[in-house]
Every structure is written in C-alpha cells, then in structure tokens.
C-alpha cells in the first residue's frame, strides 16, 4: 500500500478521555436505537423451533409490528441500554491493549486482533447478565410463551418501558437458577464474541487493502473504510453465527450444555438450523459497523487533546 494511503491512527494517549466517553455514549446509543429491532428479531428466529411462528426476518418484522406495534420491536430495550457500560469497557480495553501490544509488535493486524479479543472478554463478562434478562423480555409475546419464563399481567402497550416486567423476569431467573442463571451461556458467549471481534479486524484490514488498490488515488480513505467494515462484519457473522444460535438457545431455553444444544439443534433442524437469524444479524451489524468504522474514527478526532488537533494530519 502506498504511503499516501496510510492512515494515521489515533491512539489512546492522544485522546481527551472526558470528551471521548461523552461522545462515545451518545454514538453507542444512536446505534442501539437503530439496530435493536433486528436484534430482537434475530433472537426470536434463533429460539423458535423450525419456522413455527416466523418464516424469516421480514415476516417476523411485519408480524411483530402488527401484533405489538412499534413498542413490540423495542421490548427489553430499557434493560439492554445498560450494555452501554460494557461498550465503554470494550473501547477502553481495546485501546489500552493496543498500546500494550505495541511494545511487542508494530503490526496493526496483530494489535487489532489481540485487542479485539481481549476487549470482548471484558465486555461479555459485563454484558451476559444484561443479555439474559433482555433476551427473556424479547421473547415476551401477547398470549404466547416463547421462552422459559413469562411475565405476569397484560403486555398491552408495554414495550420499551416496563419496569414490572423486568423485575418479574429477574425474580423468575433467581427462583429457577439462582445467581448462576444470570451467567447462563457465558462460555457460549465468549466462544461467539471473542472470535467475532478477533476475526473482524484482520478481514477489515484485508478488505481495506484490496479496495485501496482498486479505488482511484483521489478516493478518500473513508470511502473504502466504510465499505470494508460491513464486508468484514458479514464475513465474521457467517463464521460465528452457528455459535450465536447455540448461545441464544442456551440462555433463553435454560440449557446447560453447549454440546447437547448443538446435537439437539442438528437433530431437529439439520445444518441450516445453524444459520438461523443470519440475515437479521447481518442487517443489524451493517449500520453499526459503518458507524463504528466511520463514526469511531471521527469520535477519536473530536476527542483529540487540544494541543494535538493541528499538530499533524490525522
């Protein structure tokens, strides 16, 4: 890659941390609002047996919208917003790990791969209990029980804000499984998200390098970065979706064994069962990845320490 194609990377020591975290929370919230409906749809598709209720992403979207309205697409959203904490822990761990690995390797791919995997380990330790509660709320549907637990009372008009539902689910999890219930599927989550995060970065650099060779010299870096991100996300989603299906079933259905869940899924639905919810996952990942690739670098530019803003070309 030619020198003028090289992108100056803003590292941890270049940032005004206060601005970085304030802008970061706002950016993350915007992403969550835009992709949450597809996260909910993906969860329901992965848990349902065969095509007993929904026949695909679009069918699920239409049926949920008809049955529960827009609020139904955001069921469990309030609880899910607590993962903003894990999101900030992710970026902090990612940046600090990059800084640490830089003492041993100057390869951007190596730094990103190790940092991505480490960041996912930290983030998932915080996210899994929130995910468990959020997923059970996602599975609530008027008049039907789709998961292990069902909230009591009328779901009519209750979507985004439903404190009573959340407390009800938490109590049922505690009663059935104790505190361990909030970490059900933890290993499966690690086996899903650590590889996903670690794999994304090498593919991102690969696609960016290939596109930089194809694009005209005057093409801005941001263009092939914005294209490379979703391509890398789609690739990582395809590779890790089987584990994501198993993770979701372990957490929602209360299964205790990854191996037994895998065997049951294969027996009931065959290999295609491992690809359930893939299109919804890619759809939800695409906008967030574009924002992460384009927005995250813009976020870091906005968060530069004042004395560094004009000191070099970022």
From Swiss-Prot:
Solcar repeats: 18-100, 107-210, 220-302
GO biological process, one term: amino acid transport
The keyword Transmembrane is annotated on this UniProt entry: yes
Catalytic activity: L-valine(in) = L-valine(out); L-leucine(in) = L-leucine(out)
Membrane-topology descriptor: Multi-pass membrane protein
UniProt GO cellular component terms: mitochondrial inner membrane; mitochondrion
Residues passing through the membrane, by range: 20-42, 71-90, 113-133, 185-201, 222-239, 278-296
InterPro entries: Mit_carrier, Mitochondrial_sb/sol_carrier, Mt_carrier_dom_sf, SLC25A44
GO MF annotation, one: branched-chain amino acid transmembrane transporter activity
Keywords in alphabetical order: Amino-acid transport, Membrane, Mitochondrion, Repeat, Transmembrane, Transmembrane helix, Transport
One protein family per Pfam: Mito_carr
Induction and repression of expression: Induction by cold exposure in brown adipose tissues.
Tissue: Highly expressed in brown adipose tissues compared with other metabolic organs.
Localization per record: Mitochondrion membrane
Main location class: mitochondrion
UniProt family annotation: Belongs to the mitochondrial carrier (TC 2.A.29) family.
Role, per record: Mitochondrial solute transporter which transports branched-chain amino acid (BCAA; valine, leucine and isoleucine) into mitochondria in brown adipose tissue (BAT). BAT is involved in BCAA catabolism and actively utilizes BCAA in the mitochondria for thermogenesis.
Name assigned to this protein: Solute carrier family 25 member 44
Organism annotation: Mus musculus (Mouse)
Protein encoded by which gene: Slc25a44
